[in-house]
Amino acid sequence: MNRFLVLLMSLVLALPVQALDLQGLYEQALTASRQGDFVEALPLWDRFLEQAPEDAAALSNRGNVRLALGDPSGAIDDQSASIVLAPEESDPHLNRGTAEEALQDWSAAADDYLWILERDPQDASALYNLANVRGSQGDWPEARTLARL
């Protein structure tokens, strides 16, 4: 019985430490990302997501890092997974659109930016990025109109 209590207490006491470690790992990954140290950030995000695979923000952040490291397809995968987990968040749509632009998938990028603009017609980032897409598609009048909004 004493062994059982000791085991139970060790598990109960370990939970807050584990949560603190996970939060610390998130902060380390975020700091490395913000400092532009993407080579360091990617394995930190990987480790965090092994323990918290349902964290939409972490998936989106890892997607940004993957794009910065030249992996637009991986970035799209992460942003898409983030969208599944948090369908009303606009950041993963914006980030996925940027990755789609890197692959010159103008139609998919435009769809992501338009999704944002349907919800917030004045979103400056979505307007700017959609203007870039329209310019890349050769629709300069539309690009100029969007850039003025």
Where are these regions (language model features)?
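Conserved structural position within tetratricopeptide repeats
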Residues: R47-E50, D77, A81-V84, W115-E118
